[in-house]
């Protein structure tokens, strides 16, 4: 159920976020406690998840702007007076942008859909890779592996850089690739200094009225990124993670009884999986930011 914010017009619902109109120039992004997996929105919710995602995004928006000069869509602090009290801590005031129709994925390691593509074709998004790679292999340099933006219930599809050029033109395509890799490198370097590997991540960008490519939506959250423990990293095996992969693993494991390739939605998550997911998200935030989640605003 989305929050009823009488002062603002509701514009759109995503898998996790609700978007409201503040005025012609600004939007209110509200992160819910919903969790999605395999293109389904699960019946279960993760307590405080929306606040954790918001706290992580605020930390990284600030870090990336200060250290790498990456512009973002924030238009006010997390306690901005335009944010209603009942969504404080899970909502942000942001600038309206012309959003670009590309999921900008950066990969530092081979896993997930990238591994599936590689095992079938020896490539990821049309990028030829050397033979002999496996689960969690580290790339010499991070890859830009874009995808389409799918509607809720549909699959994002990996696409080639040539397809990105078709969608947005060569100039913007080059900017998206360069900004994606710059942003990933800056964030991954910071995370590694805190004992966390960001194996891959997904960004969204828009263009402001001046034509600047601007980082939007969320950034380096456990929903949009794979977080691995650096001290236990071992190529060739599935890694110990802080992110949504924990939920995916339970859903596809024997305990859930769910057939991912069938036509039925996933089951509700057991209480212990809900609690463990919340703990992993909080640990990721606290390790990355050096801050206590208890001090984050809202409730």
Curated annotation (Swiss-Prot):
The enzyme's E.C. designation: 6.3.2.6
Sequence similarity: Belongs to the SAICAR synthetase family.
A Pfam entry, by short name: SAICAR_synt
Pathway: Purine metabolism; IMP biosynthesis via de novo pathway; 5-amino-1-(5-phospho-D-ribosyl)imidazole-4-carboxamide from 5-amino-1-(5-phospho-D-ribosyl)imidazole-4-carboxylate: step 1/2
GO molecular function: ATP binding; phosphoribosylaminoimidazolesuccinocarboxamide synthase activity
Matching Gene3D superfamilies: ATP-grasp fold, B domain, Phosphorylase Kinase, domain 1
Cross-referenced PROSITE patterns: SAICAR_SYNTHETASE_1, SAICAR_SYNTHETASE_2
Biological processes annotated in GO: 'de novo' IMP biosynthetic process
InterPro entries xrefs: SAICAR_synt/ADE2_N (IPR028923), SAICAR_synth (IPR001636), SAICAR_synthetase_CS (IPR018236)
UniProt protein name: Phosphoribosylaminoimidazole-succinocarboxamide synthase
Organism: Mycolicibacterium smegmatis (strain ATCC 700084 / mc(2)155)
Lineage start: Bacteria, Bacillati, Actinomycetota, Actinomycetes, Mycobacteriales
Name of the top EC class for this enzyme: ligase
A single GO cellular-component term on record: cytoplasm
């Amino acid at each position: 159920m989305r929050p009823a914010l009488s002062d603002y017009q509701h514009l759109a619902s995503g898998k996790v976020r609700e978007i409201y109109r503040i005025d012609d120039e600004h939007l209110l992004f509200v992160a819910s406690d919903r969790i999605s997996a395999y293109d389904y929105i699960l019946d279960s919710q993760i307590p405080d998840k929306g606040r954790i995602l918001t706290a992580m995004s605020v930390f990284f928006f600030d870090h990336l702007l200060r250290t790498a000069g990456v512009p973002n869509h924030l238009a006010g602090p997390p306690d901005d007076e335009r944010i209603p009290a009942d969504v404080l801590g899970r909502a942000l005031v942001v600038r309206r942008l012309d959003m670009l129709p590309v999921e900008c994925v950066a990969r530092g390691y081979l896993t997930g859909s990238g591994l599936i593509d590689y095992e079938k074709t020896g490539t990821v998004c049309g990028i030829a890779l050397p033979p002999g790679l496996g689960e969690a292999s580290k790339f010499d340099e991070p890859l830009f592996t874009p995808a389409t933006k799918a509607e809720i219930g549909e699959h994002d599809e990996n696409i080639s850089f040539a397809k990105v050029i078709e969608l947005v033109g060569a100039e913007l395509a080059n900017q998206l690739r360069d900004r994606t890799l710059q942003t990933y490198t800056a964030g991954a370097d910071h995370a590694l200094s805190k004992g966390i590997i960001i194996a891959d991540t997904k960004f969204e960008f828009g263009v402001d009225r001046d034509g600047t490519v601007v980082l939007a939506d969320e950034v380096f959250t456990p929903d949009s990124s794979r977080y691995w423990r650096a001290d236990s990293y071992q190529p060739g095996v599935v890694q110990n993670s802080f992110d949504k992969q924990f939920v995916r693993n339970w859903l596809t494991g024997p305990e859930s009884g769910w057939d991912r390739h069938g036509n039925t939605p996933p089951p509700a998550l057991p209480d212990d999986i809900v609690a463990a997911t919340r703990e992993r998200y909080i640990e990721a935030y606290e390790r990355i930011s050096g801050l206590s989640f208890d001090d984050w605003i809202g409730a």
